[in-house]
Structure formats: structure tokens, C-alpha cells
Amino acid sequence: LYVPHNNEKEDVVSPRTRVTLTDISRQSGYSPATVSMILSGRTDVSFSADTVRKVREPAEALGYAPTAKKRPSLFDRKTVLIVCPNVLNPYYSTIVQAIQQAAADKDCDTLVYTTYRDAENEIRILNAVAGSDLAGVVFTMMPQSTELVERVNRLVPVVVIGDRNTSLNVDTVEMNNYSAGAIIAHYMIGLGHKHIAYISTTLNEANSARVRRLEGVRDTYRDECPEGSVIVRSREVTPKEERDNISIEHAVGFELTRKCLGERRITAFVAVNDMVAYGVLDAIRAEGRRVPEDYSVCGFDNIFPSQFLPVGLTTVEHYIADKGRNAFEILHSKMSGESSDRNITRVEFKHHLIVRDSTAAPRGEEKTG
């Protein structure tokens, strides 16, 4: 797998005049990876007689001639690439491990590539995938280069785990982050919190899940608590910071919360994810305040440390491991030819609120519903 250097410009491999695996893929409806395995006579994978026929017939009709046998490839087994922004946040490391467990059950190998949310890194790895022998790709976040992802998906099966997005024409495992934000807001309003702070790392459309969560919180407060307010505090995190600072999410939560503690009307904090929420918790404690007696704190994701004592974190369950396993199952069905490449699968996981000890009614107030 060759990844070009920063100063190299690449695009997906252009069509050639001879009949290619891609030509047969278009005719048969199966991925180039599936076509390649059938036409090369791979013995470590099996396909139904009908699938083999649907690949061999267009190959013969088009006059496909295989190239000379290549030297052994690093990816002679079915190898899947996992693309993620980082592996420090347990949300991503849990997804990665779940994919690897599911892949091992199918005798597949995995590679992991971290982008640190850098669009150039994403483009480089996608172009490298287009010219590789990889069997499939799983994105653990919404890609920034959606058009390129769709083009690569014509060559290599791609599955994306991320925010609900009906405009992305690849297989997806989704969560409705707008609804997740609304659930937390409704709960906080019910506790009696009229003025809350939303604490986040970079807020932009490249990080759509964060924005959708905020929109869900804001809209719910506007509709259910018009006398209340959502105070937004965010800080941009560069790809270099995400790569070099292993505690950047905690640091952002800590820094922004300390700036909010002087605002007397704020009684609760909603963090964009659980890692940021830990920074919020530590900032409150550093100022000699208590959770939930003085401030309530919520997060999103339900990463595994969120249940730990002394204060369990109220958060939204995102079924992290289940999403990883499901994404690989969808990918494997494309890799093995069990599912047609012409079909797009969308799976949406329903979330729910997990209430723990980090939230309570504001001091002196009773829960309203």
C-alpha cells in the first residue's frame, strides 16, 4: 500500500484501453475485489456457482485477458483498511477493536490508518486504496472527501460509520446525532436546568456529528424552555494538535469550562463527547465545586470509562462495538459477493440516555418531569 508524500498530487487511476477488472465489475455488478478473486482462482475464499457465472460470462464476452502473475502481495489474504481520526479516544479504539474481532472471525486481516481529521491525509489514503489490493475499507467517521469516497467505492467496497447522512452513496452505519442532542436537552430541562453550556472541540461541517448534537440541544431548548439559554463554547483543534497532544479533548473541556464557571446562571454542562466531559469534570473539581451538587455534566458516546466511579457520567449510548461489528458484516457481504455492489445498505442505531451520578436538579430546585 503506497501512500504518496504531502507534495505529491494523485487522482484515482484513470481508465485504460485494455479490458480491466473494473470493466467486468461494472458489467457484473460485483466489486473489482470480488471479480479479481474469482478470475484469479483464489482457493482461500468461496463463492456461489451463480456468482462465479455472473462474473465469468461478462469477462469472456469482453475478451478479458489476465495480466502476468504478480509477485506475492502484502494483501494476499483479505485485508481491510480501517480509517479513523485517532485511536486515543476510546470511542474509536473500541470501534477498531470490534472491527478487528469481526474480521478475525472471517479470517481477514486489518490495517489502521489515522487521519487526525486532516483532509489531505484522507485524500492520500483514498488514492492509495484505489491502486491497492485491499479488499475493503471502513471509515469510523464521516469522510470529508465524500465524492472521492464514492469514486473509490466503485473500485473497493467502502462502509462508513458516522452521522445520519442520506446523501452519501455508500453503505453506512449511522446514528442520528441531532436526536441524541435533543434527548439530552429534554432531560436537562426536566431536571430544571434553564441555562447550560455546550462545550466542544472544533465545530464545523467537517465534524458534522458535533454540529448536529448542538443543533438538537439548541432547538429543544428553544421549543421546550424558551426562557432558557444554551451558551456555546468551542475551540478549534488543528490536525497537528490532535496528533501531538494525546489529551487534547480533555484539555479543551478543562480550559473552556474554567472560563464558564464565573457565569453564575450556568448550572449544567453538556460536553460534545465523553472525553471532553472528563475535562469538564476535572475543571469543576479544580475550582472546589462538586458534581452534581453544584453543576451537572452530560456527555455523548458512553465509552467504557464512563461507568467508572467516583462519579459515573450521564451520557448517550452509541452502541460503539455493535456499530463496528455491523460495519464489518456489511463490508464482508460485499467482499464475498453475498450482496450486490449495486445495493446501498443503511443501518441506523437507536440511541438512549444513560443516567448516572453526574446529573441532578439544580440546587434548591426539584425535578420537573
Residue ranges and their predicted role:
Residues 171-198, 219, 249-259, 318-337:
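Hydrophobic alpha-helical segments within soluble ligand-binding/sensing domains
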Residues 184-228, 343-358:
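An alpha-beta-alpha
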Residues 34-37, 72-87, 195-203:
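Short beta-strand segments enriched in small/hydrophobic residues
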Residues 140-183, 203-204, 275, 301-313:
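Flexible loop/hinge segments that line or gate small-molecule binding clefts
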Residues 14-20, 59-91, 95, 106, ...:
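N-terminal helix-turn-helix/winged-helix DNA-binding helices
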Residues 1-30:
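Extreme N-terminal segment that seeds HTH/winged-HTH DNA-binding domains in transcriptional regulators
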Residues 103-114, 218-250:
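Short beta-strand elements in bilobed, periplasmic/extracellular small-molecule ligand-binding domains
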Residues 256-369:
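Flexible loop/turn connectors
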